[in-house]
Amino acid sequence: YAAAGADCLSVLTETTYFKGELKDLIQVVQDQPSWTRPLPCIRKDFMVHPYQVLEAAQAGARCILIIVRGLTDEEIVPIHRSAKLAGLDTLFEVHDEAELERALRHNPDMVGVNNRNLSTFQIDLSFAERVIPHMPKSVLKVAESGIKTAEDAARMRAAGAHALLVGESLMREQNPAALMKALQHA
């Protein structure tokens, strides 16, 4: 992915549903010195405790994912504060305008709109098209999930996305480098 032009790597560390492990993040970070272009890594997990933030920093992550839907505002505060104290960026994940409003109360670095409904797992790119325009200019806007083609990427950029978080499409693609280039040039 680095050779194909990725700007960042999202590494799943959640064990129960996504079969990732913290050691996967550690391995990716440790392997990077051999790469021609090392990349920052996001710890992608259900962050529910500040201890997980410290684990992420210790493992070499540069950013954590905070899924707004899964946390109360009171639970977000110590996780976000711990990330800032550890020098990590935060990507707040939202799915609708109400979650965006909650995320913005915490002054996030980045906000990603998940096009996958976490209740039904259905994907609809119109979620990002609807939510991204409500984000302030100061926030880095990310479109997440369901981006499979250059047309999808162009659609997300037209909605105002600065970045795309693409996982499943690249994992299933026989030529992920070609897909990445197509998404980047859309």
Feature map (PLM): residue ranges:
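Acidic/glycine-rich phosphate/pyrophosphate-binding loops and surrounding catalytic core
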Residues: 2-36, 42-43, 49-55, 63
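Glycine/Thr-rich beta-alpha phosphate-binding loop at enzyme active sites
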Residues: 3-23, 103-132
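Glycine-enriched alpha-helix->loop->beta-strand junction motifs that scaffold or abut catalytic
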Residues: 5-8, 31-35, 58-64, 84-88, ...
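Glycine-rich phosphate-binding active-site loops on the catalytic face of alpha/beta enzymes
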Residues: 7-13, 55-75, 113-121, 159-180
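Short, small-residue-enriched loops and turns at beta-alpha junctions
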Residues: 15-19, 48-50, 69-73, 97-101, ...
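Alpha-helix-loop-beta-strand connector modules within alpha/beta enzyme cores
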Residues: 19-42, 46, 68-69, 75-93, ...
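Catalytic cores of alpha/beta
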Residues: 48-60, 95-107, 143, 147-166, ...
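Catalytic-face loop-and-helix region of soluble metabolic enzyme cores
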Residues: 110-166
